[in-house]
Curated annotation (Swiss-Prot):
Protein name: Zinc transporter ZIP13
Annotated organism of origin: Rattus norvegicus (Rat)
Gene behind this protein: Slc39a13
Lumenal side, ranges: 1-6, 90-108, 172-233, 298-307
Reactions performed catalytically: Zn(2+)(in) = Zn(2+)(out)
Quaternary context: Homodimer.
Amino acid sequence: MPGCPCPGCGMAGQRLLFLTVLALELLERAGGSQPALRSLGAAAACRLDSKESESWGALLSGERLDTWICSLLGSLMVGLSGVFPLLVIPLEMGTMLQSEAGAWRLKQLLSFALGGLLGNVFLHLLPEAWAYTCNISPGVEGQSLQRQQQLGLWVIAGFLTFLALEKMFLNCKEEDPSQAPSKDPTAAALNGGHCLAQPAAEPGLRAVVRNLKVSGYLNLLANTIDNFTHGLAVAASFLVSKKIGLLTTMAILLHEIPHEVGDFAILLRAGFDRWTAAKLQFSTALGGLLGACFAICTQSPKGVEETVVWTLPFTSGGFLYVALVNVLPDLLEEDDPWHLNPPLPTGTPCSRCCCSAPVSW
């Protein structure tokens, strides 16, 4: 069949042939360069895998293995101090809460807890955060002032965060007014220090019981963050030497044991029995283990300091909220404050703060 005499058809055929040849050539070049690209990608992946394996090998080496074991054991010992109050609080404390004498005993423990929380904030957490702030920016006045202002902002952030959490939990746990009356013995024990003859059935008192439970959980959250910082300190000390690590662990234990007694009293006030309170206290040890693992994995004192700079003041704000909003109002409701700690109403908090001072120094 003869070709089309139209010149336009001939030019279109030439263009189509040219594009086809060009496409085939590009495909051939792409196919030829594909092995080179694959080899480059494989080489890069091998380098990344080798670096990652070297870093993990350094973490799990024989030298680091001793640090891992000592740091985790030290953090676990600090966490086990939360079970110490079982040896101090009598077995019948749960049933005693239903009596006026039990309420008076609990108020004494709460005043001890108040002093522990305030001493922990102003004699331990905030001075340590201040020292870390000065170490990060020494000799630079502008940066030092800015970091000190950030420290105060973190305290406010911790306080407001715990306020928001308590409001959120209370709104989520709203009960139906038609529910059965509450039989929680703590509601009877904390009614101004007097025993209630009948179980509390008023909605307002049920709200008080809910508030007590939430305050206990908030204190557990603050303790978990505090134990995280303790784990950081223990692991960072063992990274320097075993001697410094052991001294740091003993210092933290001396500080934590009386503090845990106050925390145990706060949990009893929240309505938990002795064994449940001990289990919850022991669960906060997970924060210490996580802090120790974080400190060893970073292997950088600077990274630990930057973490501690905001966790310490944030925890301080949480402890201040628990002390001033949840514990102190119960002590202010006491009709005869001289019964809390004769002959001085503020003797127990002051004595607890004095216990914190030598450990902090």
